[in-house]
Amino acid sequence: MESKACAKFIRVSPRKARLIASNVKGKTVELAMNILKFTPNKSAGIILGVMRSALANAEHNAKLDVDTLIVKEVIVNEGPTWKRFMPRAQGRATHIRKRSSHISVVLSEGQE
Protein backbone atom coordinates (compact mmCIF):
# COMPACT_ATOMS: atom_id res chain seq x y z
CA MET A 1 0.00 0.00 0.00
CA GLU A 2 1.22 3.49 -0.80
CA SER A 3 0.69 6.95 0.55
CA LYS A 4 1.62 10.17 -1.17
CA ALA A 5 1.60 13.92 -0.78
CA CYS A 6 2.65 16.76 -3.03
CA ALA A 7 3.46 20.46 -2.86
CA LYS A 8 3.09 22.58 -5.97
CA PHE A 9 4.46 25.93 -7.09
CA ILE A 10 7.22 25.93 -4.45
CA ARG A 11 9.78 28.72 -4.96
CA VAL A 12 12.91 26.60 -4.95
CA SER A 13 15.03 25.58 -7.91
CA PRO A 14 14.23 22.02 -9.11
CA ARG A 15 17.92 21.32 -9.66
CA LYS A 16 18.77 22.12 -6.04
CA ALA A 17 15.75 20.21 -4.73
CA ARG A 18 16.70 17.08 -6.70
CA LEU A 19 20.10 17.01 -4.97
CA ILE A 20 18.36 16.67 -1.61
CA ALA A 21 15.64 14.33 -2.90
CA SER A 22 18.19 11.78 -4.10
CA ASN A 23 19.67 11.54 -0.59
CA VAL A 24 16.49 10.20 1.03
CA LYS A 25 15.07 7.92 -1.66
CA GLY A 26 14.91 4.27 -0.57
CA LYS A 27 15.52 4.99 3.12
CA THR A 28 13.18 4.40 6.04
CA VAL A 29 10.96 7.35 6.91
CA GLU A 30 12.61 7.89 10.29
CA LEU A 31 16.11 7.96 8.80
CA ALA A 32 15.02 10.17 5.90
CA MET A 33 13.40 12.68 8.26
CA ASN A 34 16.57 12.84 10.38
CA ILE A 35 18.68 13.46 7.28
CA LEU A 36 16.36 16.27 6.17
CA LYS A 37 16.22 17.87 9.64
CA PHE A 38 19.98 18.30 9.75
CA THR A 39 20.48 19.37 6.14
CA PRO A 40 20.99 23.16 6.03
CA ASN A 41 19.07 23.77 2.82
CA LYS A 42 15.78 25.47 1.96
CA SER A 43 14.60 22.52 -0.14
CA ALA A 44 15.30 20.07 2.71
CA GLY A 45 12.75 21.84 4.90
CA ILE A 46 10.17 21.79 2.12
CA ILE A 47 10.70 18.09 1.37
CA LEU A 48 10.49 17.37 5.11
CA GLY A 49 7.11 19.09 5.27
CA VAL A 50 5.80 17.12 2.29
CA MET A 51 7.12 13.90 3.87
CA ARG A 52 5.30 14.69 7.13
CA SER A 53 2.11 15.22 5.14
CA ALA A 54 2.56 11.86 3.36
CA LEU A 55 3.20 10.21 6.74
CA ALA A 56 -0.01 11.70 8.14
CA ASN A 57 -1.88 10.52 5.04
CA ALA A 58 -0.51 7.00 5.55
CA GLU A 59 -1.54 6.97 9.19
CA HIS A 60 -4.95 8.58 8.83
CA ASN A 61 -6.24 7.64 5.37
CA ALA A 62 -4.57 4.32 4.57
CA LYS A 63 -4.20 3.08 8.21
CA LEU A 64 -0.62 1.95 7.57
CA ASP A 65 1.97 1.14 10.23
CA VAL A 66 4.29 4.16 10.16
CA ASP A 67 7.26 2.18 11.54
CA THR A 68 7.51 -0.01 8.43
CA LEU A 69 7.28 2.72 5.80
CA ILE A 70 10.08 3.53 3.37
CA VAL A 71 10.50 6.43 0.98
CA LYS A 72 9.63 4.89 -2.37
CA GLU A 73 9.91 8.04 -4.50
CA VAL A 74 10.70 11.70 -4.17
CA ILE A 75 9.78 13.35 -7.46
CA VAL A 76 10.81 16.93 -8.19
CA ASN A 77 9.30 18.37 -11.36
CA GLU A 78 9.76 21.82 -12.79
CA GLY A 79 6.98 24.33 -12.20
CA PRO A 80 6.44 27.65 -13.94
CA THR A 81 9.28 30.14 -14.15
CA TRP A 82 8.89 33.82 -13.32
CA LYS A 83 10.95 36.03 -15.60
CA ARG A 84 12.47 39.22 -14.28
CA PHE A 85 14.99 41.74 -15.58
CA MET A 86 17.98 43.21 -13.81
CA PRO A 87 19.18 46.59 -15.06
CA ARG A 88 22.83 46.60 -16.10
CA ALA A 89 25.32 49.15 -17.27
CA GLN A 90 24.82 51.30 -20.36
CA GLY A 91 21.08 50.69 -20.67
CA ARG A 92 21.27 46.93 -20.92
CA ALA A 93 19.32 44.36 -18.93
CA THR A 94 19.84 40.69 -18.10
CA HIS A 95 17.24 38.01 -17.59
CA ILE A 96 16.61 36.52 -14.17
CA ARG A 97 14.64 33.27 -14.07
CA LYS A 98 12.96 32.55 -10.74
CA ARG A 99 12.25 28.85 -10.96
CA SER A 100 9.62 26.87 -9.07
CA SER A 101 9.09 23.18 -8.33
CA HIS A 102 6.38 20.60 -7.87
CA ILE A 103 7.50 18.10 -5.19
CA SER A 104 5.84 14.70 -4.62
CA VAL A 105 6.72 12.13 -1.96
CA VAL A 106 5.52 8.51 -2.14
CA LEU A 107 5.81 6.26 0.92
CA SER A 108 5.21 2.51 0.80
CA GLU A 109 5.38 -0.48 3.09
CA GLY A 110 8.34 -2.75 2.62
CA GLN A 111 11.98 -3.41 3.31
CA GLU A 112 14.81 -0.92 2.83
Swiss-Prot record:
CDD domains (UniProt xref): Ribosomal_L22 (cd00336)
Disulfide partners: none
Lineage start: Bacteria, Pseudomonadati, Thermodesulfobacteriota, Desulfovibrionia, Desulfovibrionales
Signal peptide span: none
Complex formation: Part of the 50S ribosomal subunit.
GO molecular function: rRNA binding; structural constituent of ribosome
Function of the molecule: This protein binds specifically to 23S rRNA; its binding is stimulated by other ribosomal proteins, e.g. L4, L17, and L20. It is important during the early stages of 50S assembly. It makes multiple contacts with different domains of the 23S rRNA in the assembled 50S subunit and ribosome. The globular domain of the protein is located near the polypeptide exit tunnel on the outside of the subunit, while an extended beta-hairpin is found that lines the wall of the exit tunnel in the center of the 70S ribosome.
Pfam family, one: Ribosomal_L22
GO annotation, biological process: translation
UniProt entry keywords in alphabetical sequence: Ribonucleoprotein, Ribosomal protein, RNA-binding, rRNA-binding
Entry protein name: Large ribosomal subunit protein uL22
Gene name per UniProt: rplV
Family: Belongs to the universal ribosomal protein uL22 family.
Cellular component aspect of the GO annotation: cytosolic large ribosomal subunit
